[in-house]
């Protein structure tokens, strides 16, 4: 028997694809949401054939926030779990020269994800059950010259998830904040990432599935990142501002 569905936003991303396999393996029906969702037809067919679960495709644009309420209303079934894997790394130097890419990064990493989860939060609250998962970033723990546009948006998203968790804690709805650290994905392709600090998409998916099952609040996919960010955040601003980070 197929379990209640999991809704994956940003379903084309490597992490979302790994999550689709992880939840389908557990017998969960899947709702895959992305722009140009029809291009995920081969993924849909493979998941259904491989795991024997129902998989549906849903057109979704994170930046078209005026459509988010209708998107949720038109779902064939309200999911039990919703995971937002929407994000855009962008190029920091381009964002410093031109506000257009900067705003796109901010909207893709904060406004869009927060908007759709806010809509779902209201539906989950009315039902008094469900789990919302937001994939944020350790980059949001402290602003750094090398990625402060992206980091600032993730900082906002992390704060949003914290507040949402506080609001819904006694309403039967759980909120999970995921801080992956480096992940080997298409988004980071070409970057020199330290292997010891870099997770694979399947590793992130397993950590998220476990966090949902155990009702964890905030997770670092690799625990070493908790230590690293504790150290980074403890450096006095008078010293930190002169560091090359």
For the regions a protein language model found, what residue spans apply to each?
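C-terminal helical subdomain
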Residues: 177, 193-230
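Residue(s) in the substrate-gating loop at a strand-loop-helix junction
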Residues: 137
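Rossmann-fold cofactor-recognition segment
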Residues: 48-66
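Active-site helix of classical SDR
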Residues: 117, 153
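Conserved glycine-rich cofactor-binding loop
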Residues: 12-13
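Conserved mid-core segment of classical short-chain dehydrogenase/reductases
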Residues: 87-103, 146
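Active-site loop immediately N-terminal to the catalytic Tyr-X3-Lys motif
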Residues: 142-148
